[in-house]
């Protein structure tokens, strides 16, 4: 039986789409649910392209009710994947999916992580600090932003003439290539 993946996303969903595409006809896993805190997030449209059920929630329903957590449990989700999801995940979610909830971050953690460090803010800080390399970190989710145990990292050079946008392009390429592969590896290790 295929293992089910739930994706939590807040934005356009390019990583989510790469994951949905990768697992569309996969023997090990499938994306069973895409959840978003934004009703106008483009990730919801991308999910429709793959016939993946979606669910939208607000802050109240995410933090003060069991609705979202119960939906994931009732769907039989094995792995929860954060892909551009910008809210801190409640402790009861983390307890329900111990070492089965992961996130991707556009920097080499522990550097450039934490609250407010996402997207262009990360790349601006990396360039401002004249770093020689950046990359991606895939990590387990815990109660602190970008603090969970690192599962996988990939590096890329920060070029002297890089802008936040040019660096972001190379980071996105790493994300799109490696996130589905790491998810596949984790699914293979789950009972």
At which residue positions do the language-model features occur?
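One-carbon transfer enzymes
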Residues: 1-191
């Amino acid at each position: 039986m295929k293992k089910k993946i739930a994706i939590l996303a807040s934005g356009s969903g390019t990583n989510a789409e790469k994951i949905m595409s990768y697992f569309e006809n996969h023997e090990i896993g499938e994306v069973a649910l895409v959840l978003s805190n934004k009703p106008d997030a483009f990730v919801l449209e991308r999910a429709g392209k793959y016939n993946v059920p979606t669910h939208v929630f607000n802050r109240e329903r995410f933090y003060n009710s069991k609705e979202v957590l119960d939906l994931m449990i009732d769907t039989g989700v094995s792995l929860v994947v954060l892909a551009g999801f910008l809210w801190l995940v409640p402790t009861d979610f983390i307890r329900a999916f111990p070492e089965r909830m992961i996130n991707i971050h556009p920097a080499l953690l522990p550097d450039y992580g934490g609250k407010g460090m996402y997207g262009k803010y990360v790349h601006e800080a990396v360039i401002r600090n004249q770093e020689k390399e950046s990359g991606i970190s895939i990590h387990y989710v815990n109660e602190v932003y970008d603090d969970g145990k690192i599962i996988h990292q990939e590096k890329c050079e920060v070029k002297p003439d890089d802008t936040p946008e040019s660096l972001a392009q190379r980071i996105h390429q790493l994300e799109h290539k490696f996130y589905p592969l790491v998810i596949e590896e984790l699914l293979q290790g789950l009972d």
